[in-house]
Curated annotation (Swiss-Prot):
Organism, as annotated: Chlorobium luteolum (strain DSM 273 / BCRC 81028 / 2530)
UniProtKB keywords: Hydrolase, Metal-binding, Metalloprotease, Protease, Zinc
Short motif (JAMM motif): ranges: 171-184
Keyword Hydrolase (UniProt): yes
Keyword Aminoacyl-tRNA synthetase part of the UniProt annotation: no
Stored SUPFAM superfamilies: JAB1/MPN domain, RuvA domain 2-like
InterPro entries: MPN, RadC_JAB, RuvA_2-like, UPF0758, UPF0758_CS, UPF0758_N
Lineage of the organism: Bacteria, Pseudomonadati, Chlorobiota, Chlorobiia, Chlorobiales
The protein's name in its UniProt record: UPF0758 protein Plut_0598
Amino acid sequence: MRIHDLDPENRPRERFLSSGPSALSSAELLALVLRSGTRHLNIVDTCQRIIAENGLERLASMTLGELQKTPGIGQAKAMQIVAIFELNNRLHHTRNTNRRVQGAKDVFEYMSGRIPDETQEHLFVLHLNTKNQVTKCVRVTVGTLNASLIHPREVFKSAIRESAHAIILVHNHPSGDTEPSNADRQVTTLLKQASAVIQIDLLDHVIIGKTSWFSFRESNLLG
């Protein structure tokens, strides 16, 4: 069935105009953006399928090639989907500019959407000013943390150049389990000692999962 074959009151566009975007399902909202389907698939059915198979969270990180594996999604529609989520990421980043950090929860929320490939570990350094506002986010390494491979010079280089007052380390655990490993503890100890020498305070090391986080400071493990 094509969208035009639906009763007018059941069409996504008409319902959007009469009741607002909150009245539509995620598939219907996506269908409004993509607009048209194929001869054999209407766009709402196509959007329902892609969301049912992947969920919004995975959909937000899918590549053009992955999206095009869904029947009815060609290159142009795949680009539209990627563009929607990229705009959302940029809005999130804009809202978090100069965000004041008062605890690990703030760090978790700030980092939401900033990790490009959550199947790998990424180590980030957040620069803070004297008001504990984040002034910069720098990715230092990609891959499992290892104290023998991470040199304090690389971690603090940008912070020194930017005259940061303090830093916070952030890295993700792809498994979702935020419990620190022995390597995480060793890296934290190494960088805390270096921060005392460099005189740029290491305020915290936060490990983030999909829905939770672990704070070395809040767990009294920062030293």
